[in-house]
Curated annotation (Swiss-Prot):
It is found in: Cytoplasm. The lineage of its organism: Bacteria, Bacillati, Actinomycetota, Actinomycetes, Micrococcales. Residues 581-640 form the KH domain. The keyword Magnesium applies. GO terms for biological process: mRNA catabolic process; RNA processing. PANTHER family: POLYRIBONUCLEOTIDE NUCLEOTIDYLTRANSFERASE (PTHR11252), POLYRIBONUCLEOTIDE NUCLEOTIDYLTRANSFERASE 1, MITOCHONDRIAL (PTHR11252:SF0). It comes from Renibacterium salmoninarum (strain ATCC 33209 / DSM 20767 / JCM 11484 / NBRC 15589 / NCIMB 2235). The gene is pnp. This is Polyribonucleotide nucleotidyltransferase. Mg(2+) binds at D515, D521. It is an enzyme of class 2 (transferase). Its main location: cytoplasm. One of its GO terms (cellular component) is cytosol. Pfam families: KH_1, PNPase, RNase_PH, S1. The keyword Membrane does not apply. Residues 652-724 form the S1 motif domain.
Length: 746
């Protein structure tokens, strides 16, 4: 019996001394009822299935393209059973959601404008080498299946991750190789003539970048180096696009004619343009956002009212045309006059304010304002056992720094759903997190779990980069010793034909309207020395790398200005808040871990109960002690040291011990945790007026503190004790006082 015909193509990525990677695209075997399906392999041991399907009818009432991208992480792909209660996959992991965004962002602009049929792309991870990162493979898989589906799609789109390792940009790096990388970028693009146009960038400095740069002399990811990385990604993207195009030419379905719903017809655009263009020019010279929005809404109502009788039943088209005319007015003013909506020049930054310690009791807090964008950052510190546990296909199983971003509807003066975070909020939190991770202190330097929350209280452009700035302030206020402060800025781009030539204008610190009416949202975060994170989204089919390089340099000037404002508010870490827990680290021999824990956890539980501290022990012998105050932490440290780093007791040493048990032949006294001695019944006579002791409990009781002296240590290390009576203690004190006096006399 003959099976289905399988067709394939391959892209071989040559990384020189780092070896070759083979990306194989295959179709014809799996998911044959989907409109388009493709299996994509990387080096034969990681396999993803991408399936693209489309609804048969357009979605009614939709004025946008209903594209859905999903990633299904199957735990069997890594030979694991899910760790959830029901032992099956549930809601998508954060990594899966971020992978969805990586695919959606370059794919969405490539669909024909006006498509209203629902399109769904589902990528399922079927097999994975734990050392591989699957997200960038998923970009290529989703592009491949969409090309095969017969949808109106201007692919192929290639995606590649390049990492700067030992001064070389390496494509498709493995997790193990990323430990030596200082910077990594996911770049997606398409072939445009003889060049590659970039459609999406997601980049960050690595966790180890600071140490690699400062201690090992690795190349810092400056704007120039990042620009080189964008150029280095182009040949890889081209090879991936060519492999996809080769398979699509042989196996793709014919493009289906789908109904296209234009936002408006030409006759309505001409009427709206004639009625509103001149007035809109005046409206968009108003600097204040609310006043400008109110004037724009009033003009829109006026235009709709005046034209509705002429274009009966086409009010939606009039509204859409009004938005298009607004966009045209704003863009032409920027390109021709170099003046923006609020009257700023292309490189001007709005008014900045920065303030720390804005909330009581929390461990760290700050507010950062840029124009009408207002972000509050709040930092919480806790024991390392509170770090996030991760159950995903990634080899990363825990995360010490957790950055959450909240965008309530009131931040834009609207109503809406509140509750669990949406994909956008997860993406913005991840971006701010990546911007700050490279400058965080190590676990050894600062043994705390850190949760950073960014509250977008007011939004008019780039709340994610505002979150980076507010977080820098808040972390320093909480006492986190950052290696360097980080600031972020959002850049925009407007491009159009002016006098027969394509002209580009890069905008610094974009407004929300400039984001909506522009062609690019380009976010750049970093220190004064290098870039720590980048995110690029575009509405165009691609942007020349030279334009992006110029925008990077423009962003650096803005970043340095913002860093000056942050440093004026707080330039060194504050003292830890009195409400923050105190965490200290103790190193003990690995073979002593069992003694500290004790049988069934008896010893460690006893220390925690006695001191009120929380204790966690790492496999390497590092013990983290957390307590609400310093004395509790110090007491726990002393108790642990007494067990794991003990001094050998000697005859004659005195201790203030605690009676832990009484027997017919005496009392056991605890000197230090794990070290007890016997106070024999005959010795108890010394504290019973020399009388015979018939019942030990009549003389001492469990829990009683008693001063004792070690009188004997037998061959097995057993300690014999004697009580220190008042006369003995006084004599000992006199002898100790006499010794320095005699020394001085001599």
């Amino acid at each position: 019996m003959e099976g289905p015909e399988i067709q394939f193509s391959e892209a071989v990525i040559d990384n020189g001394r780092f070896g070759k990677r083979t990306i194989r695209f295959e179709t014809g075997r799996l998911a044959q009822q989907a409109a388009g399906a493709a299996m994509v392999y990387i080096d034969d041991d990681t396999a993803l299935l991408s399936a693209t399907t489309a609804g048969k009818q357009p979605r009614e009432g939709f004025d946008f393209f209903p594209l859905t991208v999903d990633v299904e992480e199957r735990m069997y792909a890594a030979g694991r059973i899910p760790g959830s209660f029901f032992r099956r996959e549930g809601r998508p992991s954060t990594e899966a959601i971020l992978a969805c965004r990586l695919m959606d962002r370059p794919l969405r602009p490539a669909f024909v404008k006006g498509l209203r049929n629902e399109v769904q792309i589902v990528v399922t991870v079927l097999a994975i080498n734990p050392d591989e990162l699957y997200d960038v493979v998923a970009i290529n898989a989703s592009s491949m299946s969409t090309q095969l589906s017969g949808l109106p799609f201007s692919g192929p789109i290639g995606g590649v991750r390049v990492a700067l390792i030992e001064d070389q940009w390496v494509a498709f790096p493995r997790h193990s190789e990323m430990e030596k990388a200082v910077f990594n970028m996911v770049v997606a693009g398409r072939v445009a003539g003889d060049d590659v146009a970039i459609m999406m960038v997601e980049a960050e400095a690595t966790d180890n970048s600071w140490n690699l740069i400062k201690e090992n002399g690795a190349t810092a990811p400056t704007e120039e180096i990042v620009s080189e990385g964008l150029e280095a990604a182009k040949p890889f993207i081209k090879a991936l696009c060519e492999a996809q195009a080769d398979l699509a030419a042989r196996a793709a379905k014919p493009t289906v004619e789908f109904p296209i719903f234009l936002d408006y017809q030409d006759d309505i655009f001409e009427a709206v343009n004639a009625a509103a263009a001149a007035k809109l020019t005046e409206v968009f010279q108003i600097a204040d956002k609310q006043e400008r929005d109110n004037a724009s809404d009033a003009l829109k109502d006026e235009v709709v009212s005046s034209l509705s009788s002429k274009f009966d039943g086409r009010e939606k088209e009039i509204s859409a045309a009004f938005r298009s005319v607004t966009k045209q007015v704003v863009r032409q003013r920027i390109l021709k006059d170099q003046i923006r909506i609020d009257g700023r020049g292309l490189t001007d930054i709005r008014q900045l304010t920065a303030e720390v310690e804005v909330l009581p009791r929390v461990h760290g807090s700050a507010i950062f304002e840029r124009g009408e964008t207002q972000i509050m950052g709040v930092t919480t510190l806790n024991m390392l056992k509170m770090e996030q546990q991760i159950d995903s296909l990634s080899p990363v199983t825990r995360k010490r720094y957790m950055h959450n971003y909240n965008f309530p509807p009131y931040s834009t003066g609207e109503t809406g759903r509140v509750g669990s975070p949406k994909r956008r909020e997860i993406g913005h939190g991840a971006l701010a997190e990546r911007a700050l991770v490279p400058v965080l202190p190590s676990r050894e330097e600062f043994p705390y779990a850190i949760r950073q929350v960014s509250e977008a209280l007011s939004s008019n452009g780039s709340t994610s980069m505002g979150s980076v700035c507010a977080s820098t302030l808040s972390l320093l206020n909480a006492g986190v010793p950052l290696k360097a402060p980080v600031a972020g800025i959002a850049m925009g781009l407007v491009s159009d034909q002016v006098d027969g030539q394509t002209r580009y204008a890069a905008l610094t610190d974009i407004l929300g309207a400039e984001d909506a009416f522009g062609d690019m949202d380009f976010k750049v975060a970093g220190t004064s020395e290098f870039v720590t994170a980048i995110q690029l989204d575009t509405k165009l089919d691609g942007i020349p790398a030279s334009v992006l390089a110029a925008a990077l340099k423009q962003a650096r000037e803005a970043r340095l200005h913002i860093l000056g404002v942050l440093n004026a508010a707080i330039d060194v870490p504050d003292e830890l808040s009195e409400f923050a827990p105190r965490v200290i680290a103790v190193k003990i021999p690995v073979d002593k871990i069992g003694e500290v824990i004790g049988p069934k956890g008896k010893m460690i539980n006893q220390i925690q109960e006695d001191t009120g501290a929380d204790i966690s022990i790492e496999d390497d012998g590092t013990v983290y002690i957390g307590a609400t105050n310093g004395p509790s932490a110090d007491a726990a440290r002393s108790a642990i040291n007494a067990i794991a780093n003990p001094q050998i007791p000697e005859i004659g040493e005195r201790y203030l011990g605690t009676v832990v048990k009484t027997t017919t032949f005496g009392a056991f006294v605890s000197l230090t945790p794990g070290k007890d001695g016997l106070l024999h019944v005959t010795e108890l006579r010394k504290i019973n007026d020399g009388k015979r002791v018939d019942n030990v409990d009549d003389v001492v009781s469990v829990g009683q503190k008693i001063q004792v002296e070690i009188t004997k240590i037998d061959d097995r290390g057993k300690l014999s004790l004697s009580p220190v009576v008042a006369e003995d203690a006084a004599a000992a004190d006199s002898a100790e006082a006499a010794e320095p006096a005699e020394a001085a006399a001599n």
